[in-house]
């Protein structure tokens, strides 16, 4: 990878719009990044977090290469699903979505995802959406249907389909669709303002010049992005399932309003499979983050699992894969522990370790600059660990070398966010509960129960050691 004229390494990203890898060149500083966030009708599942981890990696790599970033991630707190949930439970929309929003932020922290600069909620931008709908109506791009909903006329946007590479003139279009989500076979005019239906919507609606109702999902993102980042942004990211219709419709709305390109780069992560199959509650392979935490896996292990594959490849999520990630993190933890051992004092870094470190940093940078190739970056990391361990084994290692290697690891961890520098373990709540129960059993001299609990703790990948100061929990 070459360096750019401003001494910043060239970064290449696969642009869904062109179906090619392109040299990243932002319009201005900071980079304007918009990512599709959660629809808070339920707890986010690991498929969602595969996308959020990819978006976090993208942001971290931009920061690593010296870009400043203004990041907006939306929260969809009104759509078909959130409305249905609130009505079913006969509560307000805010009351229904609040626990899922709170859980989302807790999950983000658990997975060490860097916070966005703003998390706009759709319900906070209704007035701006109404202004946009009025303009689209006045320009003849939108119309009011017989059901009193407002629709975007896709024939009024000649380049409709350019992101998903649909040829509009070759498709059989139905008249209109009011659902937020649909597939290409149901290509149609899409809803901007969904008219109120008492039986469907209960007590939830907003007043508007077009009648009671609520905004369409696609319009929400367009307005929040343009309000917070301006009419044209640098990168819009999400999952492949967002390409059509969501991102396609965002482009149509936004560019009809601003007459400017909405986003210069479009990045999309592939689907996550569980044991080779699509995740489904009916198949029993549907997992939220808290499901996995309750089974004894840590946030770092789950992050590593979701991080390790290239974002444009499907990720097969398995328990065996999680166990392998646990071992990879143990190898990192053991390496750091070894680096923190005492070594001979030296005022300078050994030439061999300096060359090894510089070569690794270049290989790591080249990998992530090539469309976020994290698999190659991780391979270079473990090769660096192997080479460093060999020098330690040969007693060709000093205290200065140790500090140098640790500094390199801290630098690349600004990208990875998984290297366990802290010696304190992140103990899952279920393991902590079992340790507490075992301690009670020991105090009651119920040795049989204590052994049963020890085995249960071991099944989560932890070992408990009894010391004078109390139980100590370690990973295998």
UniProtKB/Swiss-Prot annotation:
Residue ranges of the motif 'KMSKS' region: 278-282
Query: Where ATP is bound, by residue?
Result: 281
Q: Which cofactor does it need?
A: Zn(2+)
According to its UniProt entry, the protein's GO biological process terms are: cysteinyl-tRNA aminoacylation
Classification via SUPFAM superfamilies: Anticodon-binding domain of a subclass of class I aminoacyl-tRNA synthetases (SSF47323), Nucleotidylyl transferase (SSF52374)
Which reaction does this chain catalyze? tRNA(Cys) + L-cysteine + ATP = L-cysteinyl-tRNA(Cys) + AMP + diphosphate
Pfam families in the cross-refs: CysS_C, DALR_2, tRNA-synt_1e
* Domain of life, source organism: Bacteria
Q: Tell me the disulfide pairings in this chain.
A: none
- Cofactor binding summary note: Binds 1 zinc ion per subunit.
Please indicate the residue ranges that the annotation assigns to the motif 'HIGH' region.
38-48
The record's keywords, sorted A to Z, are:
Aminoacyl-tRNA synthetase, ATP-binding, Cytoplasm, Ligase, Metal-binding, Nucleotide-binding, Protein biosynthesis, Zinc
Location(s) in or outside the cell: Cytoplasm
Q: Which residues bind Zn(2+)?
A: 36, 221, 246, 250
Instruction: State the EC number(s).
Output: 6.1.1.16
InterPro entries in the record? Cys-tRNA-ligase (IPR015803), Cys-tRNA-synt_Ia_DALR (IPR015273), Cys-tRNA/MSH_ligase (IPR024909), CysS_C (IPR056411), Rossmann-like_a/b/a_fold (IPR014729), tRNA-synt_1_cat_dom (IPR032678), tRNAsynth_Ia_anticodon-bd (IPR009080)
- GO CC entries: cytosol
Query: Which terms does the record give in the GO molecular function aspect?
Result: ATP binding; cysteine-tRNA ligase activity; zinc ion binding
Quaternary structure annotation from Swiss-Prot or TrEMBL = Monomer.
Q: Which family does it belong to?
A: Belongs to the class-I aminoacyl-tRNA synthetase family.
Name the UniProt record assigns to this protein: Cysteine--tRNA ligase
Please report the organism this UniProt entry assigns to the protein.
Chlamydia abortus (strain DSM 27085 / S26/3) (Chlamydophila abortus)
């Amino acid at each position: 990878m070459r360096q750019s004229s401003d001494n910043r390494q060239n970064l290449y990203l696969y642009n869904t719009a062109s179906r090619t890898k392109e040299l990243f060149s932002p319009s201005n500083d900071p980079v304007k990044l918009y990512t599709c966030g959660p629809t808070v009708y339920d707890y986010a599942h690991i498929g969602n977090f595969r996308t959020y981890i990819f978006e976090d990696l993208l942001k971290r790599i931009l920061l690593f290469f010296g870009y400043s970033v203004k990041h907006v991630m939306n929260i969809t707190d009104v759509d078909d699903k959130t409305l249905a949930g609130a009505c079913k439970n006969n509560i307000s929309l805010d009351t229904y979505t609040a626990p899922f929003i709170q859980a989302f932020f807790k999950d983000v922290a658990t997975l060490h995802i860097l916070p966005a600069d703003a998390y706009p909620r759709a319900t906070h931008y209704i007035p701006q959406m109404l202004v946009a709908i009025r303009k689209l109506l006045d320009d003849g791009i939108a119309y009011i249907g017989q059901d009193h909903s407002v629709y975007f006329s896709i024939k009024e946007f000649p380049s409709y389909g350019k992101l998903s590479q649909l040829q509009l003139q070759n498709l059989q279009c139905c008249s209109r669709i009011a659902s937020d989500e649909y597939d290409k076979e149901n290509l149609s005019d899409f809803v901007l303002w969904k008219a109120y239906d008492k039986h469907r919507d209960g007590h939830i609606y907003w007043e508007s010049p077009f009648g009671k109702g609520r905004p369409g999902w696609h319009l929400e993102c367009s307005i929040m992005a343009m309000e917070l980042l301006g009419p044209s942004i640098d990168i819009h990211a999400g999952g492949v399932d967002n390409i059509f219709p969501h991102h396609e419709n965002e482009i149509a709305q936004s560019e009809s309003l601003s007459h400017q390109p909405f986003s210069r780069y479009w990045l999309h992560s592939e689907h996550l499979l569980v044991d080779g199959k699509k995740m489904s509650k009916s198949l029993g392979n549907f997992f939220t983050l808290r499901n996995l935490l309750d089974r004894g896996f840590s946030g770092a292990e789950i992050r590593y699992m979701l991080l390790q594959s290239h974002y444009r490849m499907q990720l097969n999520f398995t328990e065996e894969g999680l166990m392998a990630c646990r071992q990879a993190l143990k190898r990192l933890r053991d390496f750091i522990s070894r680096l923190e051992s005492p070594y001979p004092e030296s005022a300078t870094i050994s030439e061999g370790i300096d060359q090894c470190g510089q070569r690794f940093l270049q290989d790591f940078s080249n990998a992530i600059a090539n469309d976020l190739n994290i698999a190659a970056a991780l391979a270079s990391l473990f090769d660096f660990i192997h080479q460093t361990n060999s020098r330690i084994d040969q007693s060709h290692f000093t205290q200065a070398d140790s500090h140098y290697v640790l500094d390199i690891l801290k630098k690349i961890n600004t990208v990875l966010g998984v290297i366990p520098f802290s010696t304190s373990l992140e103990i899952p709540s279920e393991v902590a509960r079992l340790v507490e129960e075992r301690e009670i059993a020991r105090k009651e001299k119920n040795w049989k129960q204590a052994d049963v609990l020890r085995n249960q703790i071991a099944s989560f990948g932890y070992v408990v050691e009894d010391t004078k100061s109390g139980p100590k929990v370690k990973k295998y």
